Amino acid sequence: MPTPRLWSWNLSPFAGKVRVAFAEKNVAIELVEIDPRQRPKRLRELNPTNRVPVLELDDRTAVRESTAICEWLEDTHPGTPLWPADPDARATARGLLRWVDDELTTNFFLSMRKEAFGLEDEDHPELVTILRSRLQQRWSTAEQLLSRTDGPWLIAGEAPTLADLAAAPLAVRLPAWKPDLVPDAEAFPQVDAWLSALRERPSSAEVDRRGAPAADR
């Protein structure tokens, strides 16, 4: 099988989730970096929605959307599993992944208007206030979820699942981009330990990895 080609954008937390998952399994990828302001024609050919991440397997096959790509990775490279072996725990982890993607990652990324898109917070101050409030509320929910396990992961066990790894881009970038939104360690000790554990994993280096520019292809 040729090396899969991952079409990515460095700042996309969903592309970052995929890069981290490949690193956890030690599976090589060819990384192609797009500029979201000048998306190459090839990207739309691979994904009619014109979004990343997209995993290009060959001239005719592409896997779209971050979770679908990670499921393909799990099916084709079962070593270092991304999901628990137990069916009940696996179903729970899949539900938690959806929550992390929809409630944590999305609110975090939309709060990063200036850092990700060069947009000033002053343009829509009410939107920024709402997004920040939502993120703070999500820390409370995350604390409750994490308190059900022995820590530091969302599912009891020694290794993280994809539900945890999906939060790696947030764990890495939040202290650098928006330190005022970092959860208070005293108020949310479980969340603090969770984010710290994600930052300490070698795979977290993939969050800042950039590929070869798509324009150079």
Describe these PLM feature segments.
Residues 1-129, 148-150, 154:
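GST-like domain detector, emphasizing the conserved glutathione-binding G-site
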Residues 9, 162, 211:
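Short, solvent-exposed turn/loop segments enriched in Gly/Ser/Thr/Pro and often Arg
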Residues 100-197:
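GST-like fold's C-terminal all-alpha helical module
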Residues 185, 189-217:
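Long hydrophobic alpha-helical segments typical of transmembrane helices together
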